[in-house]
From Swiss-Prot:
Binds 1 copper ion per subunit. The lineage of its organism: Eukaryota, Fungi, Dikarya, Ascomycota, Pezizomycotina. It comes from Aspergillus tamarii. Cu(2+) binds at residues 22, 108, 197. The keyword Zinc-finger does not apply. Its cofactor is Cu(2+). Its EC number is 1.14.99.56. This is AA9 family lytic polysaccharide monooxygenase F. It catalyses: [(1->4)-beta-D-glucosyl]n+m + reduced acceptor + O2 = 4-dehydro-beta-D-glucosyl-[(1->4)-beta-D-glucosyl]n-1 + [(1->4)-beta-D-glucosyl]m + acceptor + H2O. Induction: Expression is up-regulated on steam-exploded bagasse as carbon source compared to glucose.
């Protein structure tokens, strides 16, 4: 009995260690408008009373990762047992979206990858296994001259745990799922060691583009032994193959990471509700930082907003 209790305790401790220091996207900012994400600390316990948000929901309250064993599971699409957000937010093609993470551990080096998948007729009722994702951003190794190097997520940390991604100007208007992901490689030197942290948001893209890029279903984005999944970061790195399909030809590369000034707080829309077109703009300022008087402060203490002390990081070209 003592042996069983000790084994159970060890398992519990290992599980706690696994999920203790990871993260999730707490909010997004589009053209200065702050939109709350899925709050893992409260929403799962609120049932139908949880606010309507564009973020996909997940019972993963421990902030834990997905493993390569999950790549063929629907969990890899938008995280563990994720269901579509009930709302959506509007964005103009060519605008930039700032995604705010909870503090990301500095040891978890790896790429930042973003995808879009078109939803028809909308994203709130979409079958996630039918979504076909095309890559619009992928930043891997930025500077490999020292070990373990400077990676995409190191730029995210430097930029107050935020990431800017640009919605391609050339895509056709309509409803899309934005799939944003960090892949931690600190244990990826052997098979099964990579850690994936996907988050999804429902968008309605406005514009006059016509492209409808072909995509890949989420369960076929990666393989456990694919390029960039098994990778030893504890060596001098001259190049790195960002996992996933080839970058969409219309994607904006080399987006300079910068904080987004918050000017107001927005609420996700639902299909059929009156909508307004977001103001034109890049959605980010390389020098402006949020001030305490610039916007209504979100009431949830768990929803982090970009810090005024975050400095813009250097530009990094998207890797293929």
């Amino acid at each position: 009995m003592r042996h069983v209790q000790s084994a159970s305790l060890l398992t519990a401790l290992l599980s706690a260690t696994k999920v203790a220091a990871h993260g999730h996207v707490s909010n997004i900012v589009i053209n200065g408008v702050y939109y709350e994400g899925f709050d893992i600390n409260s929403f799962p316990y609120m049932g139908e009373n949880a606010p309507t948000v564009a973020a996909w929901t997940t019972p993963n309250t421990g902030n834990g990762p997905l493993a390569p064993d999950d790549y063929s599971s629907p969990d890899i699409i938008c995280h563990q047992n994720a269901t579509a957000g009930k709302g959506y937010v509007e964005v103009n093609a060519g605008d930039r979206i700032s995604l705010q993470w909870t503090p990301w551990p500095e040891s978890h080096h790896g790429p930042v990858v973003d995808y879009l998948a078109r939803c028809e007729p909308n994203c709130a009722s979409v079958d996630k296994t039918s979504l076909e994702f095309f890559k619009i951003d992928g930043v891997g190794i930025v500077d490999g001259s020292s070990v373990p190097g400077v990676w995409g997520d190191d730029q995210l940390i430097k930029n107050n745990n935020t990431w800017l991604v640009e919605i391609p100007k050339s895509i056709a208007p309509g409803y899309y799922v934005l799939r944003h992901e960090l892949i931690a490689l600190h244990s990826a030197g052997t098979e099964g060691g990579a850690q994936n942290y996907p988050s999804c948001f429902n968008l309605k893209v406005n514009g006059d583009g016509t492209d409808k890029p072909a995509g890949v279903v989420g369960t076929e984005l990666y393989t456990p032994t694919g390029d960039g999944i098994i990778f030893n970061i504890y060596q001098t790195v001259s190049s790195y193959p960002v996992p996933g399909p080839t970058l969409y030809t219309g994607a904006a590369t080399g987006v300079t990471q910068a904080t987004s000034a918050i000017t107001s707080t927005g609420t996700a829309l639902t299909v059929g509700a009156a909508a307004t077109t977001p103001a034109s703009g890049s959605g980010a300022s390389s020098s402006a930082a949020p001030s305490s008087s610039a916007a209504a402060t979100p009431s949830r203490s768990s929803s982090a907003v970009p810090s005024s002390s975050a400095a813009p990081s250097s530009s990094a070209a998207a890797s293929r």
